[in-house]
């Protein structure tokens, strides 16, 4: 169509979480710069740009306690850690931009996670979080 938007059907939607959804979309992600949108978010403003300087994940700030996936940033403003739960924290929320360079590193790990028993209810972000923490290599070596 005019904007080259792809809507994908995931036959595992009722029994698996978003890891399976992004796994199903992997051929559209390889070698491309891609936005991923959450189906339950509404964007008031046009968020698309003809150029993005790199991969990013949007975030929102929560005052007080939260059970969301909270972010820690390094001095350059890049995500350096993610933990479930926090206080007065930025958390993962909304659209994501995956650069082809990021996807080249991330997709092989996501594909391997999809094959591991027990990952059926993983969010697609779990392999990324495990990569940040150095746990992805360990998990993959043990399976």
What name fits each language-model region?
Residues 43-118:
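Conserved core of the sugar-phosphate nucleotidyltransferase
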Residues 35, 96, 121:
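Residues that recognize and position ribonucleotide moieties
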Residues 2-69:
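Conserved beta-loop-beta/alpha segment of the NTase-like Rossmann-fold superfamily
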Residues 129-142:
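Catalytic donor-sugar/metal-binding loop of nucleotide-sugar-dependent glycosyltransferases
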Residues 4-6, 78, 137-139:
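Conserved beta-strand segments of alpha/beta enzyme cores
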Residues 116-127, 143:
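An accessory alpha-helical subdomain
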Residues 8-10, 82, 141:
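Hydrophobic residues at beta-strand termini and immediately following loops
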């Amino acid at each position: 169509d005019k904007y080259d938007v792809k809507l994908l059907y995931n036959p595992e939607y009722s029994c698996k979480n978003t890891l399976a959804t992004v796994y199903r979309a992997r051929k559209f992600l390889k070698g491309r710069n891609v936005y991923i949108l959450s189906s339950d978010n509404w964007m008031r403003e046009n968020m698309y740009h003809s150029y993005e300087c790199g991969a990013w994940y949007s975030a929102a700030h929560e005052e007080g306690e939260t059970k969301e996936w909270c972010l820690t940033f390094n001095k350059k403003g890049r995500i350096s850690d993610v933990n479930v739960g926090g206080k007065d924290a930025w958390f993962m929320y909304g659209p994501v931009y995956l650069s082809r360079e990021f996807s080249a590193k991330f997709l092989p790990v996501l594909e391997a996670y999809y094959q591991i028993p027990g990952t059926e209810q993983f969010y697609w972000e779990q392999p990324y979080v495990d990569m940040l923490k150095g746990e992805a290599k360990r998990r993959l070596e043990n399976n």
